[in-house]
Amino acid sequence: MNYQDNSLKSLKLGQKTEYASQYDRTLLQPVPRALNRDGLGITQNQPFTIGADIWTAYEISWLNEKGLPQVAIADIYLDYQSQNLIESKSFKLYLNSFNQSKFTDFNAVQQTMQRDLSECAQGDVKVRLNPVAVYDAQKINHLQGDCIDEQDIEITSYEFNANWLKDCVSNEIVEEKLVSHLLKSNCLITNQPDWGTDQAQQAILTARNNKLNFETQRKTAEQTLRNLLNLKPNEALNITFPHIMNVKTAGVNLNVPVSVIANRPDVKAAQFRLSSAFKNAKATQKSWFPEVNLGASLSSTASTVGTALHNPVAAGTVGISLPFLNWNTVKWNVKISEADYETARLNYEQRITTALNNVDTNYFAFTQAQSTLSNLQQTHSYNQRITQYYRNRYNAGVSELREWLVAANTEKSSQLAILNAKYQVLQSENAVYSSMAGYYL
């Protein structure tokens, strides 16, 4: 037999073979995946993150310790990252070598096969032995996804051409699951066609696009740091970035004087416009505008930010009272008209109200973000246990690989949600500091 590659000349396919009367692991013969992957340029980096070659062996048999024949059907999964496939004839010869060999139980046979196949494939291989009775209630189901076999298209060439794949690349981000029953590949050994069903889920572009966005955001943040530190592009930014889950929140302290919001630029500007209306600002400061802050500008029931946020609310805004700024109280010291003064006073009150509402809203968002993070952490803990549950069931041969992979994917999604929630906590905490014009102990 003429082979396409010299590495295949040692295979027993096409040769006369003797029946193996006892279990023999040396019958297995590998076929390197690189024979096909090198031509596609995907030997080192595959364009997918999960996958397996799945074999179903319908004629598994061995003897128990009393010499009684046992039968089973095996599901065998060769991980896509394994170095080798296993040549089909050698695979069948190997499985048949179990027929006249004694094993203690199902588990012993399963572990033996899994060990031998993993060594031959040089990768992860899972074996699940099922009693024949398991298939009594098994239904034939349709694969999830959109079948593309009924497209009204014309095909004129059946030769492999990798350039066609390049034309499929688009900037459009898509997420889809496609199914086809028309997968045909010619065997490297016999050049005969093998038919199969293929299910492909294309979501990798979305993941790559998100990664690019995150890298761009990080570069923008790095630029800001370089500007602040006056560093040139070729100078090292000697900063160690901690993992976001290790970043501790400083905490928000609302038990501080309301006067702290006087440091806000908008409040300070309104305060300046109002104070400029007086003939003698220094005299008025001692009477009703002490130390040029907002502490005396609020009602006596709102001496701290925390209590100010609990004042009666009307139409969704915090109500404040500034009786000492009434016209009758200060008209002797005002150098502008009553109308202009009232405009400045109202603007001043509105700025204070806006500032307090801003603090209130941001603090509420902060507490909500903390609750969300706590809930997601509990959810992730449950998902970890669910993944372990399905992994144990799969290793025990009572659950499908697909169920384990779905659970693992859900666990990873919840882990990403936790990272995003922690980021939201930090952002909302900083928003509170910003609305209070600083962090206060």
From Swiss-Prot:
This is Uncharacterized protein HI_1340. Gene3D superfamilies: 3.30.1130.10, Outer membrane efflux proteins (OEP). Transmembrane segments: none annotated. GO terms for biological process: transmembrane transport. SUPFAM superfamilies: Outer membrane efflux proteins (OEP). One of its GO terms (cellular component) is membrane. It holds the Pfam family OEP. It comes from the Bacteria. PANTHER family: CATION EFFLUX SYSTEM PROTEIN CUSC, OUTER MEMBRANE CATION EFFLUX PROTEIN. GO terms for molecular function: efflux transmembrane transporter activity; transmembrane transporter activity. Belongs to the outer membrane factor (OMF) (TC 1.B.17) family.
